[in-house]
């Protein structure tokens, strides 16, 4: 069994709008494969401000 690890820090603030949803996508072409996310960490330094609607 082959195992791969991907570890990448991406400054999302430079690429995405203020409100965004994060997800995963993977493919192997025509072959079958199982893709497992064994660990996920997300950190945000977003300053939350309250607003009256």
Swiss-Prot record:
What keyword terms does UniProt attach to this protein?
Lectin, Mannose-binding
Gene Ontology molecular function, alphabetical: D-mannose binding
A Pfam family matched in the record: Lectin_legB
Known partners and oligomeric status: Tetramer of two alpha and two beta chains.
The entry assigns this protein to a family as follows: Belongs to the leguminous lectin family.
Protein's UniProt name: Mannose/glucose-specific lectin alpha 2 chain
Species annotation? Lathyrus ochrus (Cyprus-vetch)
């Amino acid at each position: 069994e082959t195992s791969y690890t991907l570890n990448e820090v991406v400054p999302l603030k430079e690429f995405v709008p203020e409100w965004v949803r994060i997800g995963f996508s993977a493919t192997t072409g025509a072959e079958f494969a199982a893709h497992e996310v064994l660990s996920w960490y997300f950190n945000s330094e977003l300053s939350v401000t309250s607003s009256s609607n």
